[in-house]
Amino acid sequence: MIAECIKKVASHSDLSVYEAKGAMQDIMSGNATDGQIGAFLTALVMKGETSSEIAAFASVMRENAVQITPKRNGMLVDTCGTGGDGKNTFNISTAAAFTAAGAGVTVVKHGNRGATSKCGSADVLEALGIKIDISPERVCEIIDENGIGFMFAQSHHPAMKYAGKVRKEIGIRSFFNLIGPLSNPAGADAQLLGVYDSPLTEKIAEVLNILGTKRAMVVHGDGYDEITTTGITQVSEVNDGQVRSYSLDPSSFGFQKADAASLFGGDSQYNAHIIRSVLSGDEGPRRDIVILNAAAAIYLGERAGSIADGIKYAEKSIDSGLALEKLENLILLSGGKNDS
């Protein structure tokens, strides 16, 4: 299948859902050669991937994942980004995940080690003392008990090994950078998903809609794959089959405009220190951006009727110590080590 698809894509023709799924299954099953994978990825980048193609690729990745089924106490929410924005911030969506969990949202956090940054979510969680390479069954138990757990992508997507070498060798951004965040192994009902380029907000929202995601906010703010406090964020929101796009201004929620330098991160140990400081109540621009992103996750998880209400719940989560408690519990339950 993939050989025929390469020819079609090279002629700048779009793939049908059947063709896209077939090509992706060839990759995920190890039936495609490295040369075929490289040619396919390159041709797709040159043509440009359609929403239906990306959805088809993601659906196959989901089918090949080691999935888990946590108990549903309301919506299951994931907070993640594509990475690749080049901003080198601390791990904002990871801090927001603990804050949302402290507000009563069940968070099924999915992530990996950093590819384009010094520190991915897996790296910073490990630096915080969390054991990340645990069985999927144990992750499911932790989510049920703690209301937040972490699914390490390498443990849940073993078939990705077939594409890993080629992706590194060709060194170009491809649909694989997009479908990881679209392939939550717990079947998240709602997602706060940051993308590295503004035009992707609508396209990825369309993909999530095709995949049946109940609620989502796909965001890109002032160059960040986050809701930002440095400027305006472009949002494409999915809500029960409908997609609407709008701009979000942090000043309308009372946040001061942040300077980009105040959001810089570093290596995993440095970023872990920042997250623990924010969850411990330190104030300033780092707290502000975590609060704003957590508020969106709380809103998507239907624990708040609006982002404005979500901000109040996020602030309470941190100030009450509940967000930090979720972190401490995850360290303990994962069998990790707390060095704080």
From Swiss-Prot:
GO molecular function: anthranilate phosphoribosyltransferase activity; magnesium ion binding
Enzyme class: transferase
Positions with a binding annotation for anthranilate 1: G81, N112
Keyword line: Amino-acid biosynthesis, Aromatic amino acid biosynthesis, Glycosyltransferase, Magnesium, Metal-binding, Transferase, Tryptophan biosynthesis
Annotated function: Catalyzes the transfer of the phosphoribosyl group of 5-phosphorylribose-1-pyrophosphate (PRPP) to anthranilate to yield N-(5'-phosphoribosyl)-anthranilate (PRA).
Catalytically driven reaction(s): N-(5-phospho-beta-D-ribosyl)anthranilate + diphosphate = 5-phospho-alpha-D-ribose 1-diphosphate + anthranilate
Positions annotated to bind Mg(2+) 1: S93, E226
GO biological process: L-tryptophan biosynthetic process
Assembly mode: Homodimer.
Binding site for Mg(2+) 2: D225, E226
Family affiliation: Belongs to the anthranilate phosphoribosyltransferase family.
Cofactor(s) needed: Mg(2+)
Record EC number: 2.4.2.18
Record organism: Methanocorpusculum labreanum (strain ATCC 43576 / DSM 4855 / Z)
Gene3D superfamilies: Nucleoside phosphorylase/phosphoribosyltransferase catalytic domain (3.40.1030.10), Transferase, Pyrimidine Nucleoside Phosphorylase, Chain C (1.20.970.10)
Protein name (database record): Anthranilate phosphoribosyltransferase
Protein residues bound to 5-phospho-alpha-D-ribose 1-diphosphate: 81, 84-85, 89, 91-94, 109-117, 121
Pathway linked to the protein: Amino-acid biosynthesis; L-tryptophan biosynthesis; L-tryptophan from chorismate: step 2/5
Keyword Ribosomal protein tagged: no
Binding residues for anthranilate 2: R167
UniProt keyword annotation of Glycosyltransferase present: yes
Domain of life: Archaea
Cofactor note as given: Binds 2 magnesium ions per monomer.
Disulfide bonds: none
Gene Ontology cellular component terms for the protein in this record: cytosol
